[in-house]
């Protein structure tokens, strides 16, 4: 793919999309399968940059797996316990937060000597809530460059015990502790301090741990108790549901300029919080129909909305660009953790929305958007952030073209996104 992509105005969106596998689920079940006893066959697996970093790390740690030629099926042979390596190694996690954070916890078990590093942005992202919690359980962790951020040196040592974790930065930290704690020497109790962000992702983690035979008790998502010496057990086969955040772009496109779009792979039984974005569109005026494994959207007269989007911060970016096609202001609240993602998303989204003529008020944890009477053609800087690229592709639904810089950044989670968008628009 070239350094930029010109999207011509799209007249209408219509059709059916089969969603790629969820990135969040794919990387969780990859790790759970590696820790489990037995072989696990993962279908509708997501082949993307983030899952490849997880696979490469697992391979370096001695985990055996095979991936089908089309990349959608992965078979993992579990090691039936903690991941260890007899020699010091360095693992690259790219900009995959799930890989960096989950492995930081899991590799704090045992006595391995591992360095975890990442890309430039990963080296700026916070790790201290997780590292502080792991150190309470005797984990031996050293910051190698900048305090509180990767790269990290891990020398095992985690035993369990009573841990406190700040919950206001990322739910990935809690997920990391939950996944590793069943393999600890002692029972583990985790107390979440402050507000727990992105709680649906923790619910997803607990669901998947149950699938792999692990029991966790909790009280209102404030305290978690995990028994030691548990064993992960392979379910044999696990089908990964479609990516709900990916669905948000196509559902929003239908709300703006349908037609009718049906996304297949998520529905009433989805374990992902981002499926609730369909409810947000309905509140704005779109028409939504739910099936067991699909969601349909038809257009309506969209109105601005005031929403707390803490439970689905990724889909909140889709809301920000959808707001440009609605009447009245839109306010997206409680999204401070946008600032800690692949880029400072609050600043980046504000800057790019202003290019299009929108009136923007940016706060520490919110953004207010007022659409202009006439959108302006613009060149969108993506900041190497896949979600910015995909969110701003919706601007092609206006009457003017849009240029997306570095469109390849979508390979992080959705390599063929633009092909699927073109299919729905009838341009392929």
UniProtKB/Swiss-Prot annotation:
UniProt keyword terms in alphabetical order: Amino-acid biosynthesis, Aromatic amino acid biosynthesis, Cytoplasm, Transferase
Biological pathway: Metabolic intermediate biosynthesis; chorismate biosynthesis; chorismate from D-erythrose 4-phosphate and phosphoenolpyruvate: step 6/7
Enzyme Commission no: 2.5.1.19
Signal peptide: none
Top-rank taxon: Bacteria
Residues annotated to bind phosphoenolpyruvate: 23, 97, 125, 172, 345, 387, 412
Pfam families named in the record: EPSP_synthase
InterPro entries named among the record's database cross-references: Enolpyruvate_Tfrase_dom, Enolpyruvate_Tfrase_sf, EPSP_synthase, EPSP_synthase_CS, RNA3'P_cycl/enolpyr_Trfase_a/b
Binding-site positions, 3-phosphoshikimate: 23-24, 28, 170-172, 198, 314, 337, 341
GO molecular function: 3-phosphoshikimate 1-carboxyvinyltransferase activity
GO biological process terms on file: amino acid biosynthetic process; aromatic amino acid family biosynthetic process; chorismate biosynthetic process
Subcellular location field: Cytoplasm
Catalytic site positions: 314
Chief location of this protein within or outside the cell: cytoplasm
Reactions this protein catalyses: 3-phosphoshikimate + phosphoenolpyruvate = 5-O-(1-carboxyvinyl)-3-phosphoshikimate + phosphate
CDD domains associated with the record: EPSP_synthase
GO cellular component, one term: cytoplasm
Family: Belongs to the EPSP synthase family.
HAMAP family linked to this entry: EPSP_synth (MF_00210)
Oligomeric form and interacting partners: Monomer.
Listed name of the protein: 3-phosphoshikimate 1-carboxyvinyltransferase
Gene: aroA
